[in-house]
Amino acid sequence: MDDLTRTVLGHVDPRELIDLASALIRIPSFKTDETPVARYLADFFRQRGYDVDLQEIEPGRLQTIATLRGTGGGASLMLNGHTDINALTRRWRRDPWTPSLEGDHLYGHGVQNMKGGLASIIMTAEAIRRSGVRLAGDLVIACVAGETQGGEGTHALMESGLRTDAAVVAEPFGADHLVTVHSGIVHMAIHTYGVTGHIGRLEGTVNAVHKMTAVIEALQGVRFRHTPRPDLPAFPRLNVGGILGGRGHDYVLVEPPYVPDVCTIIVDVHFVPGQTVEDILADIRRALDPLAAGDAELRYEIEIPPPASFKGRRRLVMDPFDMPVDAPIVQAVARSYRAVTGQEPKAIGTVLPHSYSADDTCHLWKAGIPCLLYGPATIRGNADEDDACVLVSEMDRVTRVLAATALDVCQRKPADLALPSRR
């Protein structure tokens, strides 16, 4: 490790990581309601001299993009983390909004996915700023909204035109894992339509719920045409995640004497690199069309994204992500990991179960930004579990590795970050 890196790492303080993550825990930021935490972060960065863009991704909904400006000529690096958090589960044994430190475990709702990672990327920039080291390239800290809705904040950021030469997304996949592969996700609504009428006269009625039972059964038999990925053996896979039936598109549920004329299921499909949404729809229709052809009363419709009336729905498709492990940004993080820990990363590439998810790297890569996933994990694998926590030691390690990465990347020329095949 060189003296410059050692100087910067001397400004990484685990206590400050705990304090910042704790402050973020105290601000609830469920999807679509990230603005309070965005304003908090904007104030945090402004007080420390960063260039701050409080970006409005839709009316009244904000996300914070902070930049530590370089001196010029160097490659730019984005560290990306989302401010939205998962739904609150019911069996917490602690107050989910009061941070609790027990040994190496910091508890609090949202710290796992992913306010612990947010604290790490922010304190990465702070370690560099406070050391007095000036990077040649810009270091962008993107605190984005709406990742759990398909990456709405990062998508909006790309639509705004911002680009960096490389990026790291600090999802909670482990401080010893460099993840370069994930599945794709598409959410859809499938509707069946019937004809309503009173229970006293069922002639001429069609029960949309009954028709949906046949649709669900057919969906269980969908066979996706794809090239298998041995590293993602469970996918592609379809799940019917919710069902609602009633009268009209408001799904009136309080008139059970009447036949329901609308039924909707919400379907999730996780798919592998090489598949497209068009492929998936064709495979689903190939299962459902014969059903409709054999039943004149069965009418179905597929809607992507699900209707706006389903609050918090996933509005964007997240395509599969497959970054070459020899990409310069991947190798830069690997070098930094070795320099900081004196060891080899436990894994580079596909890491299960983490690669079975999807995340904001899909939008960054689609915009041409080489990237990977590297962030602090927890003792458990499910970000929605009760009593969620993050390991402070993981936050500390990630911060140190990313600080070393920024020193490496931002002193290079932008061309040095291009994929070998693009040179």
Indicate residue ranges for each PLM-predicted region:
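Acidic/His- and Gly-rich active-site-bordering loop/insert found
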Residues: 2-107, 130-135
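A short, acidic/glycine-rich surface segment
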Residues: 86-88, 151-153, 175-178, 224-227, ...
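Fold-level recognition of mixed alpha/beta catalytic cores in primary-metabolism enzymes, strongest
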Residues: 106, 112, 116-221, 230, ...
